[in-house]
Swiss-Prot record:
It is found in: Cytoplasm. This is Polyamine aminopropyltransferase. It catalyses: S-adenosyl 3-(methylsulfanyl)propylamine + putrescine = S-methyl-5'-thioadenosine + spermidine + H(+). The lineage of its organism: Bacteria, Bacillati, Cyanobacteriota, Cyanophyceae, Synechococcales. Its EC number is 2.5.1.16. It comes from Prochlorococcus marinus (strain SARG / CCMP1375 / SS120).
Length: 287
């Protein structure tokens, strides 16, 4: 993390693999929770932003590029969406997108760090919107890995893994045993969606995580899009299904309704995102 004071604000930077990514603005608050360092930063370009352990997580004016794209391929592909699980997602953005679906009856949001939720509600309320007041949302401040391990078989129609980078409290979300438990608790006609890092800035992590999911699920495919505040701007999400590749084929009536509420996601965008796999990444996934 590097800050250079000047009259127009400070540069707040994330360092990854000898590359620096930064935004100019001012720090609002920074604290150490029981799990990680949490920073709220008001950027000149993208509004208020959240950082965990010095890594950009989300920002007000570009968060839809992430949250729409981790949620809708899964919820538009699953046969039913009565019961949905989100692991992580303490900023509320993924929950907000899930709760757009009237068919959804129960949304379990499992966040390990209550301060992420509290600070997001206080400073980033535009991201979560009204999700925190929705009676369908069940917020549990506990360990998501243990929650999945203890859940009953075939418990959920959709599982969204909206964790941070594979370090600190989120490290266990990039583990094969964790994905095996997700497979066990996912209904046969359901869909799993997970953030799987950047194929450019974190190629090894991306390759290893996608391969891991492919080893556990019969059908799994990475989808690629852009998130400006993330290293390199290129990001990925991987979607997986059990009986058939439901994540590749959105239910049209559901997708047409939801896409009208979105700034980025649409069935057409989704097709392009799955097709956008870089040739070198595709070859490495086949090795």
């Amino acid at each position: 993390m590097f800050e250079n004071e000047n009259p127009n604000g400070s540069w707040l930077d994330e360092y990854q693999n000898d590359v620096r990514y930064g935004l100019k603005g001012k720090k609002i608050i920074e604290e150490i929770s029981n799990f990680q360092k949490i920073t709220i930063f008001e950027s000149n370009r993208y509004g208020k932003a959240l950082l965990l352990d010095n890594c950009w997580m989300t920002a007000e004016y570009q968060e839809k590029q992430y949250h729409e794209c981790i949620v809708h391929p899964a919820l538009c592909g699953s046969k039913e969406i009565n019961k949905v699980l989100i692991i992580g997602g303490g900023d509320g953005g993924s929950a907000r997108e899930c709760l757009k679906y009237q068919e959804l009856k129960n949304l379990d949001l499992i966040e390990i760090d209550k301060r992420v939720v509290e600070l997001s509600q206080q400073y980033l309320s535009v991201i979560g919107g009204n999700c925190w007041k929705d009676q369908r949302l069940n917020l549990k401040l506990t360990n998501g890995i243990n929650w999945v391990k203890d859940a009953k078989d075939n418990s959920y129609d959709v599982i969204i893994i909206d964790g941070s980078d594979p370090k600190g409290p989120a490290k266990g979300l990039f583990n094969k045993d964790f994905f095996k438990d997700c497979h066990r608790i996912l209904k046969p006609d359901g869909v799993l969606g997970a953030q799987t890092e950047s194929p450019e800035s974190f190629e090894d992590i991306h390759i290893n995580t996608v391969k891991m999911i492919k080893e556990v699920f019969k059908y799994a495919d990475p989808l690629y899009g852009y998130v400006p505040i993330y290293p390199s701007g290129i990001w990925s999400w991987t979607f997986a299904s059990i009986k058939k590749p439901r994540h590749l084929y959105p239910i049209i009536s559901r997708a047409n309704t939801i896409s009208k509420t979105c700034q980025v996601w649409s069935p057409r965008w989704q097709r392009g995102g799955f097709d956008a796999i870089p040739a070198n990444i595709e070859r490495k996934l086949q090795q």
